[in-house]
Swiss-Prot record:
The keyword Mitochondrion does not apply. One of its GO terms (molecular function) is RNA binding. This is Eukaryotic translation initiation factor eIF-1. NCBIfam families: SUI1_MOF2.
Amino acid sequence: MSIENLKSFDPFADTGDDETATSNYIHIRIQQRNGRKTLTTVQGVPEEYDLKRILKVLKKDFACNGNIVKDPEMGEIIQLQGDQRAKVCEFMISQLGLQKKNIKIHGF
């Protein structure tokens, strides 16, 4: 006979809070620059996609400038000028075939 109630349980912990589950999300964030200027950052794009080609299409479709930044902790991040969060989310779903549940939009 085993006693099952001796396990530690945190009632305030988020359900499904593991490191592997958070790594498969695509995070779209907005950052404030000078005054009204903003940057949109896209982090966590899966490895099978070519970030340079995605950036080229995003820049052309949204008529904005952008670049790819290499971060030691976060990996490669796409930066776009302006608030492009909704457009990037729609692009990821329609063009890349990603699911909306895997995309997190942060900011304001």
